[in-house]
């Protein structure tokens, strides 16, 4: 999870890069913040996928077997 203010800082640095450019320290900070953001995003997305169930219009569970296997591993079954 991103700490409060990190997304705002990412956006600030992105806007500054477009308008006036960034110092080397700011470029490094921007890269680190982006990596943290991507890590949090991927973790959140994976968590959502591991809780997903696909159902057809008739109410039958049609979740792909690969996803079911991954969900079992994720839950430790």
Curated annotation (Swiss-Prot):
GO terms for cellular component: cytoplasm. Its main location: cytoplasm. Pfam families: DUF896 (PF05979). It comes from the Bacteria. InterPro entries: DUF896 (IPR009242). Residues 53-77 are annotated as: Disordered. Keywords: Cytoplasm. Residues 63-77 have a biased composition (Basic and acidic residues). It is found in: Cytoplasm. Belongs to the UPF0291 family. This is UPF0291 protein EAT1b_0405.
